Amino acid sequence: MPWIQIKLNATNDNAEAIGDMLMEETGAVSVTFLDAKDTPVFEPLPGETRLWGDTDVVALYEADMDTSLILQQIKASNMLAEGFAHKVEQVEDKDWEREWMDNFHPMQFGRRLWICPSWREVPDPQAVNVMLDPGLAFGTGTHPTTALCLEWLDNLDLTGKTVIDFGCGSGILAIAAIKLGAAKVIGIDIDPQALLASKDNAARNGVEDQIEVYLPKDQPEGLVADVVVANILAGPLRELSPTIKGLLKPGGQLAMSGILDTQAESVAEFYRDDLELDPIAEKSEWCRISGRKLG
């Protein structure tokens, strides 16, 4: 069965209210918030909805709904400016989960490392293969920030080292580190769902005994590592710089991503006094900052 989709542009201030209006007053069967400009979203305050500054509100309706009436109702709500921009289109009903699975293919990072969906055959059984089922947590390797961190890990000699994955998400970086030779990896994340996804993916790869995961409040005191990787966002990387630097042994190596190229210098400033920084690596407007801790 086809559906009608209406897309409206909103701001962080009114997107949630517009979504509520579309559900309650116009008969939408679902409302989705999308990033309108491919910009990062920062952690919300407690009780806030996590949204972008420029947000597309996308409503889905049954095919027999009168779109002209829906647009009149939206106009009558006075929640959008006169002559508001909108896009109406018909979308075909699909098995969206199956389509996503069909389009998620094995990917190579660096010389040795492959990330493979758990439902596909590995292309090179002799390579370092991470089998991944992302579940509800971020991190599949398709985003440039994840790719930058995976390539960095592939280029290191991790044999026998301890690694901290700060903001572990799906566990993709933690598992890759183990597969690349690390003796032990500690994953830290503020989201309990991420810890569950990391555990599940670690078990799928047979490395669950080498990976520990913690909420920040539960992590062991005095925790330090030879290598720290933090694929989060520029804001937290600045705000948490004392914590992140404190996790690194003297001479240890750090990589950070989740940073737009326009934010790189402002993040680097928080680490330059304590680390010998490498040249910034860039991919599709995102970047990686890495270096070695002095001392």
From Swiss-Prot:
One of its GO terms (cellular component) is cytosol. Belongs to the methyltransferase superfamily. PrmA family. Its EC number is 2.1.1.-. CDD domains: AdoMet_MTases (cd02440). S-adenosyl-L-methionine binds at T146, G167, D189, N231. It comes from the Bacteria. Signal peptide: none annotated. GO terms for biological process: methylation. GO terms for molecular function: protein-lysine N-methyltransferase activity. InterPro entries: Ribosomal_L11_MeTrfase_PrmA (IPR050078), Ribosomal_PrmA_MeTrfase (IPR004498), SAM-dependent_MTases_sf (IPR029063). Keywords: Cytoplasm, Methyltransferase, S-adenosyl-L-methionine, Transferase. This is Ribosomal protein L11 methyltransferase. It catalyses: L-lysyl-[protein] + 3 S-adenosyl-L-methionine = N(6),N(6),N(6)-trimethyl-L-lysyl-[protein] + 3 S-adenosyl-L-homocysteine + 3 H(+). It is found in: Cytoplasm. Pfam families: PrmA (PF06325). SUPFAM superfamilies: S-adenosyl-L-methionine-dependent methyltransferases. The gene is prmA. Methylates ribosomal protein L11.
